[in-house]
Amino acid sequence: MEVEESLRQIERCRCPSGLYRAVPADSGVIVPVYRNVWIRDTVYTLLAFESVGDIDRLREGVYALLDRVLLRWAYRLDWRIVEGVPERDIEYLHPRYQADGSEVPGELWGLRQDDAVGLALWALGR
């Protein structure tokens, strides 16, 4: 029963793009940044689907994460591999995005969450 309720709550966070917000869009959460898609939250959500054997939702989420975020912004990862540590905030792979995988407008911050990128790559490579 608890697992089913948890899955229902997770489904409320699902975006039409297949990505997952940190909280449901209609949750009334006061802190608006939690209404965004975070790489880390999406990966942990996908790992939850894997743990209950929901391969369809797992597959859809993996494709969304790859297509909408990681491949879309891969040039930033490529740049980092070749050039090293970014000099400007905009050069980092950001930790959060809009529901469609685009950047949050006006947010040129470089909050590094390399662990989230590493977690995503680890999970995708399993």
Model regions and ranges:
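Acidic, mature catalytic/reactive cores of soluble proteins
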Residues: 1-126
